[in-house]
Amino acid sequence: MGKQRLNAAIIGPGNIGTDLMYKILRRSEYLELKLVAGIVAESEGLRLAREEGVATSAAGIQAILDRKDIDIVFDATTAHAHAQHAPLLKDAGIIAVDLTPAAVGPYVMPVVNLEEHIDAMNVNLITCGGQATIPIVYAISRVVPTAYAEIVATIASKSAGPGTRQNIDEFTLTTAKGIVDIGNAQKGKAIILLNPADPPMMMNNTIYALIDQVDPAIEQKITESVEEIIKEVQAFVPGYKLKIPPMFDGNKVTVMIEVEGSGDYLPQYSGNLDLETCAALAVAEKMAKHKLAAGAN
């Protein structure tokens, strides 16, 4: 009988890495979390991992490479760090699920294009704003050609840790590229806003699209397409909600999405981070299931 699970590791035990740890431990069917690695021995993330009985190391990427038993790594560090980690993981034959905006590997979105990249050795989760909004752009553009799409992701300032703040330029560029490459808009733009309101607000996303054709039948098809993709995202992100359904003003379509977090480790207002970790787990589970099935044949 072949392996039942792949051995997983997390590098980067910050907000995202720690939330992901709890999701793997509580929900994963195909992953066994073997290691959480960081670079600060006394960090909160490593302490919490030890409390859960998971091995930890402050030796960073080297700790993963030294073990020889890791099949898949979630990189929740920074875009700059992942650019250094990616070739090392590739040479070691370890699958990388990249939660930074580094975009070394292809962009993946569970409800849009994961099957195309199921055998890839490095996949990129785009950004939290991308995971929230690109499915909507895709839902519109599969009905009618979309000349331009712009997204505004507004997140609670408290949910933006140092990694998110360091990556803001990469966030806007990577999300805009994803709007074109995955959302199929001809041009894309992304804006991120950090809202300091207290109590913190839920993640809100506004999607604007300029479409090539307009008539009542197309409007109806777009509305149905958006509703359909929202149900697909909700299968792995229960807090993903349609706040304002498609509104049409000439050839401009506006949609608003709210994301409430699952509350595994992060507060519920951190829907932006929860969306990224939910998507990462959904991607890794499908990749692991595929790899395990291939190994059993």
Curated annotation (Swiss-Prot):
Keyword Oxidoreductase included in the entry's annotation: yes
Keywords: Aromatic hydrocarbons catabolism, NAD, Oxidoreductase
Chemical reaction(s) catalysed: acetaldehyde + NAD(+) + CoA = acetyl-CoA + NADH + H(+)
Keyword Ribosomal protein: no
E.C. designation(s): 1.2.1.10
Active site: 128 (acyl-thioester intermediate)
Binding of NAD(+), residues: 159-167, 272
SUPFAM superfamilies: Glyceraldehyde-3-phosphate dehydrogenase-like, C-terminal domain (SSF55347), NAD(P)-binding Rossmann-fold domains (SSF51735)
GO terms under biological process: catabolic process
GO MF terms held by the record: acetaldehyde dehydrogenase (acetylating) activity; NAD binding
A Pfam family the protein falls into: AcetDehyd-dimer
Protein family (similarity comment): Belongs to the acetaldehyde dehydrogenase family.
Name of this protein: Acetaldehyde dehydrogenase
